Amino acid sequence: MTPYIILLKGSEYNMSKWDKLLSRILSLSNDMRFDELQKVLESYGYVMKNPSGGSSHYTFRKDGCVPITIPKHSPIKKTYVEMVKNVIESEETK
């Protein structure tokens, strides 16, 4: 999915919040929040498993896919945003 802007009579048509969120992930934004990545992963069918034993690392699982573990810290490191970007790109090509 490519970010887009539509021009209508000289003014910009606002992208939806969802499109903006995907655009930020695809551009590997440095200010992503855990809940934003969670929202995207869950929308693609991943299920979040809560950590045990006081850990801050949440694991997202989906049948037939490699689990993704993301720590709940701010800001989210680029490595974890790249993991979610790969999910988006693989889902969009299906």
Please give the residue ranges for each predicted region.
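Intrinsically disordered, low-complexity and often Lys/Arg-enriched segments
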Residues: 1-15, 90-94
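Generic N-terminal leader/processing signal
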Residues: 7, 12-15, 60, 75-76, ...
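A charge-rich, low-complexity, intrinsically flexible signal that marks solvent-exposed coils, linkers
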Residues: 12-40, 87
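Basic helix-extension-helix modules of the SAP/HeH family
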Residues: 14, 20, 55, 66-69, ...
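Basic/aromatic recognition patch in beta-strand/loop cores that engages polyanionic ligands
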Residues: 38-76
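C-terminal structural segments of small proteins and small subunits
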Residues: 73-94
